[in-house]
């Protein structure tokens, strides 16, 4: 019996380990009949945020929307990880906190990624893209253990691949600070120049940090990319703009109704010595005229979706 239990535990451990390393099929996401392929956005990408209320602190958010991160301070199975650093008076940066935001943490908390996808056009017809909500993380702030999640809004931008301005994380989860002010910069110009550089970099970057709410445990990111569009090559594919099923039923009905009339007229032509012109009756023309607006509206509706 002990041996059987041992095998069961090993088997369960193997199952949980495989769940922790499970990938997200980012190249085949289907919502409301629309397919998205974000495979080219895969890989670990980082973005940093400096908390204005805590001078000297900065947080680096690293994510991979396709598979678990491999080089990170977060637990195994993390898809989104936050590393909070602080710089001391000697200019040495130290890691102060690590936050597991999203991932498959079956071996730790039993929570999984549980992805939720929402087509943006469903919320706003004028906005094209996909909202990706990833779960699984937990973190203790004070005495409270907060559940974490990442909300990534992938917006359609046909001029961007989505890789513009992205940073590659270091093995420890930190990153190189592009555009960071040097220590010998003048104090009077530091804030002004720093803000100007941040604004310029933000305009160039496709992945943008929006907010992190500690009370709700929610990280909000925005990602501009052509792969969020619904009709780009290797990206999204819009619902078919061809005629729908109901439209084809109407067309088939008209054809079936017209066939007996046409057959009768052809028979009459063969029976008469003099040629008799073949034409549709006035009722047929009226029927087609009445159905024409219906076809037009159906085609227009399909094209707009």
UniProtKB/Swiss-Prot annotation:
What InterPro entries does the record point to? Autophagy-rel_prot_27, Man6P_isomerase_rcpt-bd_dom_sf, MRH_dom
Write down the SUPFAM superfamilies for this protein, in alphabetical order: Mannose 6-phosphate receptor domain (SSF50911)
User: What keywords are annotated for this sequence in UniProt?
Assistant: Autophagy, Cytoplasmic vesicle, Disulfide bond, Glycoprotein, Golgi apparatus, Membrane, Mitochondrion, Signal, Transmembrane, Transmembrane helix
The stretches that face the Lumenal side, renumbered to this chain, are 23-242
Give the MRH domain ranges: 24-231
* Membrane topology category: Single-pass type I membrane protein; Single-pass membrane protein
Glycosylation sites per record: 58, 85
User: Which cysteine pairs are joined by S-S bonds?
Assistant: 26-66, 74-81, 156-229
GO biological process annotation, one example: autophagy
Residue ranges crossing the lipid bilayer per the database entry: 243-263
Q: Where is this region: Disordered?
A: 163-202
- GO cellular-component term (any): Golgi membrane
The secretion signal range is: 1-22
Q: Which PROSITE patterns would you find in this protein's record?
A: MRH
Q: Which residues lie on this side of the membrane: Cytoplasmic?
A: 264-305
Localization, UniProt:
Cytoplasmic vesicle membrane; Golgi apparatus membrane; Mitochondrion membrane; Preautophagosomal structure membrane
Source superkingdom: Eukaryota
Family classification:
Belongs to the ATG27 family.
Describe its function: Effector of phosphatidylinositol 3-phosphate kinase signaling. Regulates the cytoplasm to vacuole transport (Cvt) vesicle formation. Plays a role in ATG protein retrieval from the pre-autophagosomal structure (PAS).
Full protein name: Autophagy-related protein 27
Q: Which organism is it from?
A: Arthroderma benhamiae (strain ATCC MYA-4681 / CBS 112371)
């Amino acid at each position: 019996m002990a041996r059987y239990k041992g095998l069961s535990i090993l088997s369960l451990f193997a199952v949980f380990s495989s769940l922790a390393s499970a990938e997200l099929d980012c190249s085949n996401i289907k919502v409301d009949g629309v397919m998205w392929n974000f495979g080219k956005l895969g890989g670990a990408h980082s973005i940093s945020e400096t908390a204005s209320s805590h001078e000297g602190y900065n947080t680096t958010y690293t994510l991979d929307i396709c598979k678990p991160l491999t080089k990170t301070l977060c637990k195994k199975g993390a898809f989104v990880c936050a590393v909070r650093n602080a710089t001391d008076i000697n200019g040495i940066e130290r890691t102060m906190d690590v936050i597991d935001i999203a991932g498959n943490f079956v071996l730790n908390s039993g929570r999984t990624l549980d992805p939720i996808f929402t087509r943006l056009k469903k919320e706003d017809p004028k906005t094209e893209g996909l909202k990706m909500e990833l779960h699984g993380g937990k973190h203790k702030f004070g005495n409270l253990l907060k559940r974490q999640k990442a909300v990534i809004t992938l917006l359609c931008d046909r001029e961007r691949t989505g890789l513009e301005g992205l940073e590659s994380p270091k093995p420890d989860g930190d990153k190189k600070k592009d555009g960071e002010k040097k220590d010998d910069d003048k104090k009077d110009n530091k804030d002004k120049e720093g803000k100007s550089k941040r604004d310029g970099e933000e305009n160039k970057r496709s992945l943008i940090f929006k907010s992190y709410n500690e009370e709700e445990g929610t990280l909000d990111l925005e990602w501009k990319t052509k792969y969020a569009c619904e009709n780009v090559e290797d990206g999204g594919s819009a619902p078919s703009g061809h005629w729908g099923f109901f439209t084809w039923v109407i067309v088939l009905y008209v054809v079936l109704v017209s066939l007996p009339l046409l057959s009768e007229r052809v028979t009459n032509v063969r029976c008469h010595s003099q040629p008799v012109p073949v034409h549709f009756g006035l009722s047929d023309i009226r029927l087609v005229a009445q159905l024409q607006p219906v076809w037009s509206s159906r085609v227009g509706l399909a094209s707009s979706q």
